[in-house]
Amino acid sequence: GDNLSHLQALPYLLEILDPLFAFPGVYVPGSNCYFAPQLKNPTRYLWRTSAADRAGQDEAPQLLPTAQMHRAFDEHGWTGLINRALRLEVAGTVIDFSGVDDPHLHYDRHPGFPQDHETPADVRIGVAHAPYLRTLDRFAADGADIVFAGHTHGGQVCLPGGRALVSNCDLDPAICKGLIEHRGVPVNISQGLGESRFAPVRLFCPPQAVLVTLTD
């Protein structure tokens, strides 16, 4: 998720992702797949009760070409998991997926995992952009074996040693990146490759692409 951020970004995004289109993929959107980010007082991420928050002074957000991006993903063979559950077989491994639309925007409607199969899957994977506690709780209750998420940027601006100050959701900043465990379920939260285009800086939180190997 959060793939676009700018109205003109789609061609560049597809060029960057092109090598990955050779592999099977699933996707879910984040808020910056729908709406362009806005310039805000950065202290709002630390103190949500700022005067600007209370007054609701934000301008109307700019809509991004979300449908066009998703159509391009579909044409390259990836599968959207936008409040959707489905089963895929990848290299002989049967995977049940459950994905939700962006929890940060409260667009999430959990579909559970596929139930219309006689044989169980080899693994059940939950996918969400923002790792809100309600989302992780639901995946755990539905029987996920592992959950993948992003959104937090790993804190983006961290203390020495990588300790995040904020998570931009209700997850404790101390566990807002990397492989954590929630209600007995492994959750991998990528700190991502980018940053807000209005705050193009990372401090003690380098860009990251994650390769996770699942084993029996």
Enumerate the predicted regions with their spans.
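Binuclear metal-dependent hydrolase catalytic cores centered on His/Asp/Glu-rich metal-binding motifs
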Residues: 47-78, 82-84, 90-137, 199-202
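Proline-centered loop/turn at the N-terminus of a beta-strand
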Residues: 24-26, 79, 96, 123-125, ...
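Short, conserved loop/helix-junction motifs that constitute active-site signature segments
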Residues: 17-22, 117-120, 139-142
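Core catalytic region of metal-dependent phosphoesterases/phosphodiesterases
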Residues: 1-89
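Active-site environment of divalent metal-dependent phosphoester hydrolases
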Residues: 4-8, 32-39, 61, 81-90, ...
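Short, hinge-like loop/turn segments at secondary-structure boundaries
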Residues: 43-47, 115, 165-167
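Charged helix-capping and loop-helix junction motifs
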Residues: 10-18, 112, 165, 171-172
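Conserved beta-sheet core of the metallophosphoesterase superfamily
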Residues: 131-211
